[in-house]
């Protein structure tokens, strides 16, 4: 059975939504630029040999609608290339990599593009979740319960299933973070410390040249060039973040300093069979060892990385001790902290260059972005095995184990 190997990655800088550096770029234009950058790194590959373009997008509507994956293929002049658009919210472009893995293992193709995009700035044109009066009335009581809890002080999370009630499938991510923090006993100070850690590590990694290794500069409509992420800030300290007000509840613990911002960005990964890579004389960057996906209550979705990672590790025949570097998407410190603790991850192996709290989290981009970052990190720090994982809106988790090959 063939192995699935990664031969190229590319990503854009990550912009702040609505006010940042990429706010004037369309998602299709940005995605095409980044896919072309990834393909340019493997000139040996004939584009006509690509079997499918699978594009992850968290909210595929508005400018991100019309099956964006196929739009991008045509935009790049590849009418022969099929294209699909996949949403699994925050893990959309890890899902597309998983689909490439499965297709290669099944012998149904040799070369796939797994890409991801989210341009939240362009949501002013609409998105797939913003249409009015579309929620199922079945969840009305659960939504009202979420709203009531958000206004109360001192509320702790209780699984509604234990009372014969349905959980809130539409719950806002910030409310799930507050629920999880209380349920798992995470404090505001711990969350702030983790947020500061992310910014400080990103600041150090920028100085060391780590982040610039993976960023493809992007040209804006006005001709200016963006070559770095908007999010990282120098000199962030506990004193500086301590006074920030909570975002989601009067007595909340989630602040702008301990969760990710809203962002714009795109990333791409070129995945092929090891037999095709050998045929082309390519040395792969990494091998996809295994993946995992899990579900749990939507109201505590942030704990999703735990079971998903355990699945992926079991399928890889590895333990967490075998993993050299771990990337957990930093949607909220409130969920990364209990996830890494439950998994038994050494903090010295976790998000060692900073994470999404600093660099950002464009939903559909994140899976492919973290794959590229993890490969970059395994090379930069000379390590072998990496684990990528994230929580997923709606109460899910996803994970992938990779092995560095070059």
Predicted segments with their positions:
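Flexible glycine-/small-residue-enriched beta->alpha junction loops
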Residues: 111-179
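Conserved catalytic cysteine-centered active-site region
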Residues: 25, 57-112, 168-171, 238-261, ...
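Active-site pocket-lining segment
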Residues: 55, 175-178, 216, 221, ...
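Conserved active-site "lid/cap" helical segment
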Residues: 1-58, 62-72, 76, 176-188, ...
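Beta-strand segments within the central parallel beta-sheet cores of soluble alpha/beta enzyme folds
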Residues: 47-55, 84-88, 112-116, 190-197, ...
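N-terminal extracellular/periplasmic Venus flytrap/periplasmic-binding protein-like
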Residues: 11-13, 24-33, 44, 152-153, ...
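Condensing-enzyme catalytic core mediating Claisen C-C bond formation in acyl metabolism
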Residues: 1-27, 149-156, 163, 238-303, ...
């Amino acid at each position: 059975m063939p192995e699935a190997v990664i031969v190229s990655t590319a990503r854009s800088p990550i912009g702040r939504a609505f006010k940042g550096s990429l706010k004037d770029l369309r998602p299709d234009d940005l995605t095409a630029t980044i896919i072309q950058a990834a393909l340019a790194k493997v000139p040996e590959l004939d584009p006509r040999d690509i079997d499918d373009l699978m594009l992850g997008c968290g909210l595929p509507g508005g400018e991100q609608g019309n099956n964006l994956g196929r739009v991008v293929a045509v935009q790049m002049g590849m009418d022969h290339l099929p294209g699909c658009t996949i949403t699994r919210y925050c893990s959309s472009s890890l899902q597309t990599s998983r689909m490439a893995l499965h297709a290669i293992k099944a012998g149904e193709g040799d070369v796939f593009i797994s890409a991801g995009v989210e341009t939240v700035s362009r949501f002013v044109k609409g998105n797939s979740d913003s249409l009015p009066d579309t929620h199922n009335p079945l969840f009305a009581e659960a939504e009202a319960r979420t709203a009531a809890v958000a206004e109360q002080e001192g509320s702790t999370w209780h699984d509604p299933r234990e009372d014969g009630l349905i959980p809130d499938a539409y719950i806002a991510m910030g409310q799930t973070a507050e629920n999880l923090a209380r349920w798992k006993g995470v404090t505001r100070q711990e969350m702030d410390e983790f947020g500061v850690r992310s910014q400080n590590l990103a600041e150090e990694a920028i100085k060391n040249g780590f982040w610039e290794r993976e960023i493809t500069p992007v040209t804006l409509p006005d001709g200016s060039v963006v070559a770095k992420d908007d999010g990282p800030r120098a000199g962030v300290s506990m004193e500086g973040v301590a006074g920030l007000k909570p975002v989601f509840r009067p007595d909340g613990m989630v602040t702008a300093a301990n969760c990710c911002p809203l962002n714009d960005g795109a990333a791409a990964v070129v995945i092929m069979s090891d037999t095709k890579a050998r045929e082309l004389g390519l040395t792969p960057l990494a091998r996809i060892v295994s993946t995992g996906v899990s579900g749990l209550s939507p109201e505590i979705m942030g704990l999703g990385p735990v079971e998903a990672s355990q699945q992926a590790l079991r399928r890889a025949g590895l333990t967490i001790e075998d993993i050299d570097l771990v990337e957990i998407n930093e949607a909220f410190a409130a969920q990364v902290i209990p996830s890494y603790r439950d998994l038994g991850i050494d903090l010295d192996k976790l998000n060692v260059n900073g994470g999404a709290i600093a660099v950002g989290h464009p939903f559909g981009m994140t899976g492919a972005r973290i794959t590229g970052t993890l490969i970059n990190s395994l090379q930069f720090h000379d390590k072998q095995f990496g684990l990528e994982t994230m929580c997923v809106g709606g109460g899910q988790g996803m994970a992938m184990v990779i092995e560095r090959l070059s």
